[in-house]
Amino acid sequence: MSTPSRFKKDKEIIAEYESQVKEIRAQLVEQQKCLEQQTEMRVQLLQDLQDFFRKKAEIETEYSRNLEKLAERFMAKTRSTKDHQQYKKDQNLLSPVNCWYLLLNQVRRESKDHATLSDIYLNNVIMRFMQISEDSTRMFKKSKEIAFQLHEDLMKVLNELYTVMKTYHMYHAESISAESKLKEAEKQEEKQIGRSGDPVFHIRLEERHQRRSSVKKIEKMKEKRQAKYSENKLKSIKARNEYLLTLEATNASVFKYYIHDLSDLIDCCDLGYHASLNRALRTYLSAEYNLETSRHEGLDIIENAVDNLEPRSDKQRFMEMYPAAFCPPMKFEFQSHMGDEVCQVSAQQPVQAELMLRYQQLQSRLATLKIENEEVKKTTEATLQTIQDMVTIEDYDVSECFQHSRSTESVKSTVSETYLSKPSIAKRRANQQETEQFYFMKLREYLEGSNLITKLQAKHDLLQRTLGEGHRAEYMTTRPPNVPPKPQKHRKSRPRSQYNTKLFNGDLETFVKDSGQVIPLIVESCIRFINLYGLQHQGIFRVSGSQVEVNDIKNSFERGENPLADDQSNHDINSVAGVLKLYFRGLENPLFPKERFNDLISCIRIDNLYERALHIRKLLLTLPRSVLIVMRYLFAFLNHLSQYSDENMMDPYNLAICFGPTLMPVPEIQDQVSCQAHVNEIIKTIIIHHETIFPDAKELDGPVYEKCMAGDDYCDSPYSEHGTLEEVDQDAGTEPHTSEDECEPIEAIAKFDYVGRSARELSFKKGASLLLYHRASEDWWEGRHNGIDGLVPHQYIVVQDMDDTFSDTLSQKADSEASSGPVTEDKSSSKDMNSPTDRHPDGYLARQRKRGEPPPPVRRPGRTSDGHCPLHPPHALSNSSVDLGSPSLASHPRGLLQNRGLNNDSPERRRRPGHGSLTNISRHDSLKKIDSPPIRRSTSSGQYTGFNDHKPLDPETIAQDIEETMNTALNELRELERQSTAKHAPDVVLDTLEQVKNSPTPATSTESLSPLHNVALRSSEPQIRRSTSSSSDTMSTFKPMVAPRMGVQLKPPALRPKPAVLPKTNPTIGPAPPPQGPTDKSCTM
């Protein structure tokens, strides 16, 4: 019964094995089908991509052709125009025309780009897809062959396993059979042994012999079966071992195929497919991205051109395009009739009165017209600003129209929301047209009025020159007078700064706001010092100075002092330059903000230097005003310094290397090495094109760097530091007023509107009531308005209660001038005034050498905060060479005569010991000018004229009068010096006011040089400024100090007029100029 079940079991085993092998065989076939299907799908996908790009290339080609047609259509119209010829020549076009050409160029550029894109699709991308398809098919075939080989090997392994398994079954069955036979033999042996245990005596001999032989047979059979069993058992063990080994090998082969070989087969099919497809699609992306880059570059060019839509430059280009039409014609010359040789307006006695009357009428008429025209101008400018606000409304953002979302509701027409469809457009257009009509009406009115003013002003100026008036009285006008110069501070002992902001390692904007210094003193002073002594210094800013000296200068500035104020200071130029660099390098926020670094560096990509400068200007205009003013001042100085590169070896590039890391440090996140070259290029561009980049004084009110500086010029700016009067008030503990009555507040009424130029000056409206404390100078009061203390300009107010003689109206001075004969001669042009700080001209030094006499010593002027004492006329009597044209002699005759006749022992002198400047002049200084009495310089016309006899004065008489006047003044100076016992530190305000009252008058009496002098009912003394040249051969003159005007850049001091050619002089040697006088110690430090 056991055998059939055993065979059945063997069959089940074989059937199960065969079933498993069959499943593997079917799986191998399915794998091959899947690989084949995958390859077909790839080929189909690649075919679709080819068709897609082929169609897209056709579309791009068609689009390119249409764009080319569009551009050609409009380019054909412009090729024959003058604009196109100008564009081809130098590309200097009007900005709108430039935008138009750039639009057409952009269309042509896009046309070329799309044609290039189509070519890339056809000849590059599609070819790549075709190659990928061929490669995929070939790889599948190769992989299929390898797969068949692997399948055969796998089936051989399975067949071998089947054979080994059957062998194992067979030997195992034989072993079992032999074992059962052996067991049966053992049982028979046991039975036989059991029988042999019976008593032998009962068994017959024959039976006993028969049993013995049967036992032997059983033993032999057992031995035989034992041997058979052992043999079969060994075979079975060997067969089983072989089967197990083969089974393990088969399982390993199957596992390897499914885990490794199959993956390798798939990799063979995919070999290069994804990489090739990646390259093909990246070719497409590169083409599209480069198309967009090219488009963006073109749009950036157009955007830059749109940003440069500027009417001023277009106006200039337009006028340059038609020079013949817009060039001013030649002036009309005087055409003499029948030999008439007179070509000037005659002011002789018969017509003098008529010309005087006409001059007065023109003066009055001009004043009225200017006020009216100024109001019309303000209205015009306000209307223009309104129109500009209307036309510059930012309504061009259409980003909402391009917002994408999954919802189709957002993809709707936005035409209803555009600017042109808004309901308010009609009303806006109507308002704009109405405003434009009003603007043109006011503009026509303003132009007509300004034309009339121009004609009347020309006549007025000609009459003024003819009649010989140097300074007309301002009482004739009804418009606000020029703003007087600010009272400047004392430089003798600069007190410690009152601001709390750090100078070094601080914030520039905060420091300017806190200190009131528009240009920090350290910047202004260092630049001035280098301007005077270091422009030709080789290697300036590149060669390091003494660290000890740099620290000393730095500490002095931090204490609020100015160590460079003394012109005789022998600081090393390199140390001063090092302090300037140290200041900018230590700023908490660099001069160029870090947030603007990337924007500025991006300007390097602009090759055109002018366009680059304009782009930099656009970026810098976003900076704070205070920083921009300092930046403008610094780069104007660096540009000036680079003009001496032949001597100092510092061209703009070298200066940029020195100042680049200081002014524009590279952020830490940037590459320091690569960015530094770009930074230097930016700084170099700003140095070279600083006039283009920075707004001028008209656009940005503030100090402007002057190339020609003198020892005291750098404080001439009306933007000097505030709080100077407080420093004067604190100096020596003196009171800045001239009488005890001024201690009581005085009420005043504003005649005109005034807007303060700084926080120190008060702003007020016409008719406002002001409270005046005391007189700070001839031009300024210390007062209060609306609870705020500050400076009040004298010429803008009417004083209700004034007992002080200095504070009285200047009409008293005019009366005294009209009644004083000895001083009327001195009303000459202010251009002839001699500066006490002038150096000796070459002519004078040459004459001294010819005489064999040493020239008078040249004294460097002391420091003041402004180059002249604003509280003291610049004709200080400490200069013993009295100039007949000095305003002091013409403007203050009463004070001069009173001073001359004043008893030195009078109560007035005792009450004011040492306050007059005369007591502060040393005898040695006073005696310096006795050697060479000078001849007074001529007026601007070149000769002395008297309107009484119309004859030129004798030069010898003039020299004799000058000598007598000089000797008299010197004698009085010596007497006053001997009698003066009190010495005190000079006070700017008090000394100035005392000198105005106590100035001596010359002894000579001559006729007035100007008939207009007797006409003026009120003469305001001209505000003058002193300019001291740093070179020995440069002469400076006094010139009227006018209020700073927007757009008017400060210029170097004008040279004196040439001296008149007087009789009895060598034609090769000019007349001796007045010798150098000692410094006016009432205004110097």
From Swiss-Prot:
It comes from the Eukaryota. Residues 19-314 form the F-BAR domain. Keywords: Coiled coil, Disease variant, GTPase activation, Phosphoprotein, SH3 domain. It holds the Pfam family FCH. Residues 808-822, 937-946, 997-1011 have a biased composition (Polar residues). Residues 922-931 have a biased composition (Basic and acidic residues). Residues 1027-1037 have a biased composition (Low complexity). One of its GO terms (cellular component) is cytosol. The F-BAR domain mediates oligomerization, binds membranes, and constrains plasma membrane protrusions. Homodimer. Forms a heterooligomer with SRGAP2 and SRGAP3 through its F-BAR domain. Interacts with ROBO1, CDC42 and RHOA. Interacts with FASLG. GTPase-activating protein for RhoA and Cdc42 small GTPases. Together with CDC42 seems to be involved in the pathway mediating the repulsive signaling of Robo and Slit proteins in neuronal migration. SLIT2, probably through interaction with ROBO1, increases the interaction of SRGAP1 with ROBO1 and inactivates CDC42. This is SLIT-ROBO Rho GTPase-activating protein 1. It comes from Homo sapiens. The gene is SRGAP1.
